[in-house]
């Protein structure tokens, strides 16, 4: 990965993709930003619109492109996929989005791309797994957005409950980016203090925390029911992961990471903190879990494994 000229390709110029493109331009990340979508007229329009923002941020070449452009990219970000509609769960999207992902990954690999994949299309844990299988890439070079957005939602909720800044909250949602996710409260801290100790001192009960966990789990549905889709939060989460990759930060972020025995799991992508740098996932950090959390992780993994197995069997067979 070049330090002087970095290239990012976005595949999927819908609400999430275009919001991500805007976030990347605002942050001045990468010198070249290409956008691929079936709707080429939209990508051309977005590229022209984003180009007008570059004098206020940093010089950047922004343009609509095709898959051949991926050849020398450092990072390919996939947001393409059918959106989650009101009343749908993320797992309801499996079959149709697996087909879309397969149609995307094959031409990217054919182009000669050798960089990092970052996946955000839902259900993201299963689609990240599928990208790795379809591409044949080393597992560290395929990263899912995982529970990055969910963890941000948890930190915002805890910041309100404890009346502190969310930047001083260190807490993660883990497992599926979806209905079986859970809050790892036992390892959470606020200002370096264990969350449970601080909660007890402030008279905040575990029931209060579990209610917050449920609110976080359902926040996406509230947003979708109000405005039709979520995109600003996840786009910013994608920008943060991209920054860690492009700047080789060794940042610890909650992402969709491949399991190699962590939490007793193998051959699955699931939400957990990991070290992110120019190589993608440099290290998976196995967070100590209490009994409640360990059961939730195992149950979530079982759900993902079953759906991934069935979905991949359909598309491959």
UniProtKB/Swiss-Prot annotation:
Pathway: Fermentation; pyruvate fermentation to lactate; (S)-lactate from pyruvate: step 1/1
Residues annotated as catalytic: 177 (proton acceptor)
One annotated Gene Ontology cellular component of this protein: cytoplasm
Predominant localisation class: cytoplasm
BP GO annotations: glycolytic process; lactate metabolic process
GO molecular function terms attached to this record: L-lactate dehydrogenase activity
Signal peptide range in chain numbering: none
Binding sites annotated in the UniProt record for substrate: 84, 90, 122-125, 150-153, 230
InterPro entries: L-lactate/malate_DH, L-lactate_DH, Lactate/malate_DH_C, Lactate/malate_DH_N, Lactate_DH/Glyco_Ohase_4_C, NAD(P)-bd_dom_sf
Modified residues (Phosphotyrosine): 221
Cellular localisation: Cytoplasm
Subunit structure: Homotetramer.
Family from the record: Belongs to the LDH/MDH superfamily. LDH family.
PANTHER family on file: L-2-HYDROXYCARBOXYLATE DEHYDROGENASE (NAD(P)(+)) (PTHR43128), L-LACTATE DEHYDROGENASE (PTHR43128:SF16)
Functional description taken from the UniProt entry: Catalyzes the conversion of lactate to pyruvate.
Name recorded for this polypeptide: L-lactate dehydrogenase
The species this protein was found in: Limosilactobacillus fermentum (strain NBRC 3956 / LMG 18251)
């Amino acid at each position: 990965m070049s330090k002087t000229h970095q290239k990012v390709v976005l595949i999927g110029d819908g609400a999430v993709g275009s919001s991500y493109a805007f976030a990347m331009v605002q942050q001045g990340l990468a010198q070249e930003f290409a956008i691929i979508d079936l709707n080429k007229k939209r990508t051309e329009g977005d590229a022209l619109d984003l180009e007008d923002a570059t004098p206020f941020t940093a010089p950047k070449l922004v343009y609509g492109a095709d898959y051949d452009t991926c050849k020398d990219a450092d990072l390919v970000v996939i947001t393409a996929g059918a959106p989650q509609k009101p009343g749908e769960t993320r797992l309801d999207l499996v079959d149709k989005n697996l087909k879309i992902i397969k149609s995307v990954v094959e031409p990217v690999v054919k182009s000669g791309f050798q960089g990092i994949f970052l996946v955000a299309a839902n259900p993201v844990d299963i689609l990240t797994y599928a990208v790795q299988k379809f591409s044949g890439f080393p597992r560290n070079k395929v990263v899912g957005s995982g529970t990055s957005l969910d963890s941000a939602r948890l930190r915002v909720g805890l910041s309100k409950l404890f009346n502190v800044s969310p930047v001083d909250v260190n807490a993660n949602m883990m497992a599926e980016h979806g209905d079986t996710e859970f809050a790892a409260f036992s390892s959470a801290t606020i200002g370096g203090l264990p969350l449970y100790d601080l909660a007890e001192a402030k008279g905040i009960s575990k029931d209060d925390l579990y209610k917050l966990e449920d609110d976080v789990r359902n926040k996406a549905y509230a947003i979708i029911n109000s405005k039709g889709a979520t995109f600003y939060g996840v786009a910013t989460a994608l920008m943060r992961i991209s920054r860690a990759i492009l700047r080789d930060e060794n940042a610890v972020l909650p992402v969709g990471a491949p399991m190699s025995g962590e939490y007793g799991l193998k051959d699955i992508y699931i939400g957990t903190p990991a070290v992110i740098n120019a190589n993608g996932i440099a290290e998976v950090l196995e967070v100590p879990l209490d009994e409640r959390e360990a059961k939730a992780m195992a149950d979530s993994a079982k759900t993902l494994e079953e759906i991934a197995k069935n979905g991949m069997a359909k598309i491959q067979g």
